[in-house]
Design a protein with these regions (language model features):
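A short glycine-leucine-enriched loop at secondary-structure breakpoints
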Residues: 45-48, 102-103, 108, 167
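Sec-exported extracytoplasmic/periplasmic mature domains
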Residues: 57-60, 78, 109, 142-146
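Active-site region of chymotrypsin-like
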Residues: 26-40, 69-128
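Conserved active-site neighborhood of the chymotrypsin/trypsin-like protease fold
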Residues: 1-59, 63-64, 94, 98, ...
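Short, conserved beta-turn/loop elements at beta-strand boundaries and strand-helix junctions
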Residues: 13-17, 74-83, 160-163
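Stable alpha-helical elements in mature extracytoplasmic
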Residues: 6, 48-51, 65, 69, ...
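C-terminal cap/linker of serine protease catalytic domains
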Residues: 8, 111-167
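Generic preference for hydrophobic
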Residues: 55-57, 104, 155
């Protein structure tokens, strides 16, 4: 870290996913040496995740920038209902502040998920964090990076139970 900084601007954001892409001008404020040292994080394989897999939360899991937390995956839902889609979600036994921006990486340092507070039942248990798998948000990230907004209908499906079916 060479302690350099540059002004950034919001390129695009998605309210439904809680994701934003910021951009920095490569020609203003960042030296060529600094640009040469910047590497993109690799994406991990969420298909290999299972209960008990160790996870590192980075970003601001404790509500403070540059903090980290450690935990294990306690539950995986590969088709959790969300607005306009099904998402791969996993729940970890670690305290995290999704609103402050937290990400899950595996022990290889690859990105496997983004903390999300959309499910209110998880918010009641501060020792559990819901992460949306990187495979579920990769297209959203690519769209936001290109400056496009995510198309949204605003539909969220629910399971039809016995009582609903026969009422």
């Amino acid at each position: 870290s060479n302690e350099s900084s540059a002004d950034a601007y919001l390129k695009q954001s998605s309210q439904t996913d809680g994701l934003s892409v910021i951009a920095v001008s490569a020609t203003e404020g960042i030296s060529a040496d600094t640009l040469d040292t910047i590497e993109a994080i690799g994406y991990g394989n969420t298909d290999k995740l299972e209960n008990g897999t160790p996870v590192i939360a980075v970003g601001s899991p404790l509500g403070v920038i540059d903090s980290c937390a450690f935990g294990n995956i306690g539950y995986i839902d590969d088709s959790e209902m969300s607005t306009d889609c099904l998402q791969y979600a996993f729940y970890c036994e670690l305290a995290s502040n999704a609103a402050k921006g937290s990400f899950a990486v595996d022990y290889n340092g690859e990105l496997i998920g983004v903390a999300s507070s959309q499910k209110t039942d998880v918010a009641l248990n501060s020792a559990v964090t819901r992460f949306v798998g990187i495979d579920s948000v990769e297209r959203v990230i690519q769209s936001l990076t290109a400056g496009s907004k995510k198309p949204l209908l605003g539909i969220m499906g629910i399971d039809v139970d016995f009582g609903m079916k026969y009422s």
